[in-house]
């Protein structure tokens, strides 16, 4: 295919490329993290909140477009390319799409550096780990999405990780604080009580995010096998995977009830869950 054969990225194609409806539902962990910070700590830093909102949205845009390109490159099934992968059936230039997506990632990382200076250095390592998973989820010789670990990694990063950072940047006293001193002395201060609270309220989002991916992988099992993508349902078998599926959202509900019963989070804050896919 020559350059003249490639289609231009119009706004309708761009919205399809970034999976816009999924981006809107993906904002729920982010908004919940902001809401929980206000509820639990009585404080919202509006500058940090706006910065992280923009950074997280740019990361979400990057992930969608980047994944489409990687899936296009690694695809084995011609029918998948003709009907499912937008890079292929829309005749988009994969290089141009990558340039666009990495521009979003650059914006997100730049904002992240600003947030590190406004909070603490530990955020650099937390955010760096999240970006690592975002890139190598579909990239590399053995992408994470083609392993049975996909659900276990995407859920904690996209679900819990987003809730954690959204709360972290708004806390008056950070639960994790990293500092460097003279003579190569490093101090790491951790408030286990606050971290446990964040873990408890963030786990439902991690579980539900994994549930959505697990359901998608069950539905796409035949197509994934043709593309040599061996996810968790492949190893479990479709029948067993379908049997296990209902327990995932039930586990999320259990953690919600525990949070409400022990007054870690009020039930009203969880209204976001009614709009969360699963």
Predicted segments with their positions:
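Membrane-embedded alpha-helical segments that form the functional core of polytopic membrane enzymes
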Residues: 30-32, 36, 41-69, 124-135, ...
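Intramembrane alpha-helical segments
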Residues: 89-179, 183
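Topogenic membrane-insertion module of multi-pass membrane proteins
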Residues: 1-56, 63-65, 141-145, 154-161, ...
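C-terminal membrane-associated helical module and adjoining short loops/tails
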Residues: 2-7, 190-194, 201-278
């Amino acid at each position: 295919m020559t350059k003249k054969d490639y289609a231009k990225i119009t706004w309708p194609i761009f919205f399809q490329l970034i999976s816009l409806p999924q981006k809107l539902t993906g904002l729920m962990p982010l908004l919940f993290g902001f809401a929980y910070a206000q509820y639990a700590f009585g404080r919202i830093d509006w500058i940090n909140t706006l910065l992280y909102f923009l950074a997280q949205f740019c990361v979400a845009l990057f992930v969608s477009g980047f994944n489409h390109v990687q899936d296009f490159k690694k695809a084995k099934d011609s029918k998948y390319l003709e009907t499912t992968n937008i890079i292929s059936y829309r005749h988009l230039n994969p290089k141009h799409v990558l340039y666009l997506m990495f521009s979003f990632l650059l914006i997100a990382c730049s904002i992240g550096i600003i947030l590190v200076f406004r909070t603490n250095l530990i955020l650099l390592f937390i955010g760096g780990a999240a970006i690592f998973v975002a890139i190598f989820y579909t990239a590399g010789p053995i992408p994470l999405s083609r392993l049975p670990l996909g659900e276990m990694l995407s859920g904690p990063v996209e679900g819990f990780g987003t809730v954690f950072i959204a709360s972290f940047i708004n806390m008056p006293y950070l639960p994790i604080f990293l500092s460097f001193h003279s003579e190569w002395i490093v101090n790491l201060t951790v408030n286990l009580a606050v971290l446990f609270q964040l873990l408890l309220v963030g786990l439902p989002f991690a579980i539900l995010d994994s549930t959505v991916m697990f359901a998608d992988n069950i539905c796409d099992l035949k197509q994934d096998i043709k593309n040599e993508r061996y996810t968790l349902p492949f190893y479990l078998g479709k029948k067993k995977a379908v049997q296990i599926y209902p327990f995932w959202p039930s586990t999320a509900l259990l953690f919600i009830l525990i949070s409400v019963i022990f007054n870690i989070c009020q039930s009203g804050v969880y209204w976001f869950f009614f709009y969360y896919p699963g």
